[in-house]
């Protein structure tokens, strides 16, 4: 396996019986299971997943560590630096897309083409990482190009990048998406986002899965723990201070999270810090050259 042969690394926890019907099914639907490495928390979990996936194709099941951040660290340590890795979580039920004509496909089968295009594009233009917008409402997608390089949240449950532990691993699981994203803002200027596609997930709606690997207890305990974690990150990470707002509680649940500043504020911070201010848009589907570019 060469560094340019991408692998798919999935973090999963206590979902041996459900996993075959979630991310595994989605990958099988897209003929991608031959690249799949599954990272579980312990040896007992490994046996359960082997039993649940008996007779089904996959590359390997590896005992990593419990917890989102720890599992990501185990993935980065398992593969060589520079390896093309697609990081996925265990709750990706379906891959959906829109065609250039706006036709919606709920359970698409062309994820491989996006992955290959993503790795080729970030390597060709030195863009660092790619993800999807996860937006399925056309109203919010009006005027968006096929793909775009800009500051954007690098979703922890699906992103592709060359293995670089210093960029990818985080101390804490909470807000790891934001911590990882701002590193790419600082080093590359943003991330590559495919606007017209994403994944159906049921995060927080079902028992088990990777989400359960960092259970925070009751609503009051969750509020306390996420507030403490968010404050620690904000107070100790200068990149978070530069590109994100102070921690705030979510309106609809007992979570304290970190959200990014507005795009103009992020661009201003990049200029002040001497970070690259880069942008590109690919308006047409599958064009190899950007329609607009400041790279």
Each model region followed by its residue ranges:
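Short, well-formed alpha-helical segments that are part of the catalytic scaffolds
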Residues: 7-34, 44-53
